[in-house]
């Protein structure tokens, strides 16, 4: 199923559950295809530490030299009415997302939320010189 979804994403070039469900070549109703995709993507194996962290770790080891300072940015933003706190790596004047969490409240993040998010990312950069940037 994962290979099929990746092929569909490459073909339709959009990340929309409805568009993926429409393109999914399974002879069942549209709503059933949509629910099947939702259930599949909700499996516990699909989490940041199992899927995304190995990709970031591999990219980091290939991209940065051993004694290079890694610039991390912590930011809070609103995305489609969801309050997010994000940690990103700065690379070639771009912020590459490393980890994010949805906040259960509106408004700014507090120190506890920030340290919780940072603590999940730090193991990716063992023995690295880090510079953490944030506002306020």
Describe the predicted segments one by one.
Residues 1-136:
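Conserved, well-structured functional cores that handle cations and Mg-NTP chemistry
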């Amino acid at each position: 199923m994962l290979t099929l979804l990746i092929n569909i994403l490459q073909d339709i070039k959009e990340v929309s559950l409805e568009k993926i469900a429409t393109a999914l070549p399974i002879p069942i109703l549209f709503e059933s295809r949509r629910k099947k995709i939702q259930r599949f993507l909700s499996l516990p194996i699909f989490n940041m530490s199992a899927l995304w962290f190995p990709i970031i770790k591999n990219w980091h080891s290939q991209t940065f030299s051993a004694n290079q300072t890694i610039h991390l940015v912590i930011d809070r933003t609103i995305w489609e009415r969801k309050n997010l706190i994000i940690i990103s790596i700065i690379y070639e004047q771009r912020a590459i997302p490393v980890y994010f969490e949805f906040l259960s409240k509106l408004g700014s993040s507090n120190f506890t939320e920030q340290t919780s998010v940072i603590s999940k990312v730090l193991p990716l950069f063992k023995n690295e010189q880090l510079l953490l940037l944030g506002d306020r």
